[in-house]
Structure formats: structure tokens, C-alpha cells
Amino acid sequence: MNRCRPAAAMLTAPALALALALSLPLAGVAEGAVTASTADGFTLVIEVDVKAPPQLAYRELTVGPAAWWDPEHTYSGKAERLTLDARAGGCFCESMDGGASVSHGTVIYADPGQMLRLSTALGPLQEMAVVGTLSFAFAPREAGSHVTLTYRVFGAFTEDAVALSKLVDSVLTQQMGRFAAHVNGKD
């Protein structure tokens, strides 16, 4: 069963209102912004502080995305089916029933505790002729780490790229908020 829905169906008005309300600046809550958006693509930047040093934050991001990824944003509906092989050429993959699988992205740069970069067109972007680069940068902070997600997507969109950028920003901001809550809950 394919649970990834078209971008337009990802958020209802109440869900969007809740997402906006939850995005108020709080410790450990992800704050995201569409920093550039045109008909040909967009760039998102999402930042979060976590209570773990960069090496541990990187490990939590890469070893178990199932622990923090929202299952609503998987094809199988089960986050535990996600794996991330955090080395160059490694797959951010999902297994499904009947032997089916999906590659959500390929690792193109891995430097534990510093940077993880994937080539990826996430969710509904996968079926469009677009190219995406998703980077996670880790910087030490006195109380842990500052993690910055940058997602650049460009190409031939089959839907309005400006509208899609807002939906993708909302979903990835939610994911980073879940990541921060997961890491911060490991005190």
C-alpha cells in the first residue's frame, strides 16, 4: 500500500494551523524557512538545537531514523522499515510488503559528527524530473549541537514549485522537530 500522498494532500488546514502553532520558538523545536523559491526550484533551511554532542547527534540521525521519522511520511506506513547506510553510496531505503522497496536517497557525503549529504527527491518529488540535495550540518554548542538541514531542489516540476516548497518545508520541519525530541529525550 502506497501511503505517500500527492503533495497537495499532505496537510489539511487544521494540520497546517497546528504545525504553525507548534513552530513557535521553543528550546529544541525545529525552525524552518523557505529561503528561495522559484518556478524551477526551492531551498529550505531548518535548524534545531539538541542536547547531544555532534558525534552523538549524527549517530542518532543515521543509525535509527525509525526512532524519529513520522510513519505518515513513509510508503509502508511503518517507520521501522526505514534504514540509512551512512557512507558514500549508502541508501536511505524503505522495505515494503511483498519484497517491494524504495530508495529515498543516496548518501553522497558522510563525515560523522560534521556533515551528512544525500542526493534525494523526497516523497512526491520522486516522480518529478527534479534533483534534490539534502544536507545535515552539525556544529558544537555549549549545551550540545546545532543541526542545520538544507534542502535544495531544482528541475522540471509537474506541480507549482513555490506551493510545494511550503509543504516540503512543513514536513521536514516536523521531522526535525521529531529528531530533536528524540535526541533530547535521551538525557
Named regions from a protein language model:
Residues 57-61, 92, 107, 118, ...:
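Hydrophobic pocket/interface hotspot
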Residues 2-16:
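Bacterial N-terminal signal peptides that target proteins for export
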Residues 12-27:
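Bacterial N-terminal signal peptides
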Residues 64-104:
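Short beta-edge strand/loop motif at the mouth of beta-sheet-based domains
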Residues 54, 61-65, 69, 88, ...:
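Sec/Tat-exported extracytoplasmic proteins
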